[in-house]
Amino acid sequence: MNLEIKKDLVSNWFKTLQDAFCDDICKIEKNKSQFKSTMWKKNIKKNEGGGEYRILQNGKVYEKDEGGGEYRILNNGKVFEKVGVNFSEVYGKFPKKFQKNIPGAQKDPRFWASGISVVMHMKNPLIPAMHFNTRYIVTTQDWFGGGMDVTPSKQDKNEKKEFHKILKNMCNRHNKNYYKKYKKWCDEYFYLPHRREPRGIGGIFFDYKKNDFEKNFKFVRDVGVTFQFIFNKIIKKKIKRKWTSKDKEMQYIKRGRYAEFNLLYDRGTKFGLQTGGNVEGILMSMPPLAKWK
């Protein structure tokens, strides 16, 4: 399959998924809270998004087009304290210091990348924070990555069991080895070494899925649809549960851990900031309120 066709298929899927997620979130909010949508353009010169810059070449001024995207954020809803759904499609060149860590980038530093990421911070502290992302990156090689994970502030053994059962069933539809492999990867990735504790109850995490585009794209689509099912299921089950000020305090402390991970270790945050992504979109994963003790 032609590479440009692959890019179009993937980016269109991510856009479709962004719309589907936002529609479901608005339904959960009963349309009383709305997303604020921001379109942005990649600006590698300033290392931030939301603007344009121009290049003088051969006596003429050209706009530097290196892609962009759209991030949608809903704040202070009845159910969601903060939720962000970000789509991006960017291209350019990896900085030299970054090239050795990216497959194919040392051979040629040019890249194209598209992705969707979602982070949900809930008003009810009995409903866990949830995170999802999938991406497709092209250098001289091309591959998929992504995953999902859940971070409760109050443990719920039944919820954890059900969550992992759904993930295992989804993975088994594609390969019997996926769940064990990607769960282990997730447990190792979403871990705070300085705290010696996991960020949450895990999930799946995968990267560098290449060599069979159609098979891998089918899996990536299933990951997106499964996350949509999971967040609806968890939220609707717990949306009316009563909580206390002590529960909220625990949530704030857990959010502090969440912020620590994203700023210190998260691969997507580092990638976005080092490749000229939109700062607001990259940091949308940060919780609205957090505490440290």
Tell where the protein language model's regions lie, with residue ranges.
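Gly/Pro-rich turn-and-neighbor structural signature
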Residues: 2-103, 209-264
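Long, hydrophobic/aromatic-enriched structural stretches that serve as scaffold segments
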Residues: 78-136
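Glycine-rich, often proline-containing surface loops adjacent to acidic residues and nearby aromatics
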Residues: 82-83, 112-114, 143-151, 197-211, ...
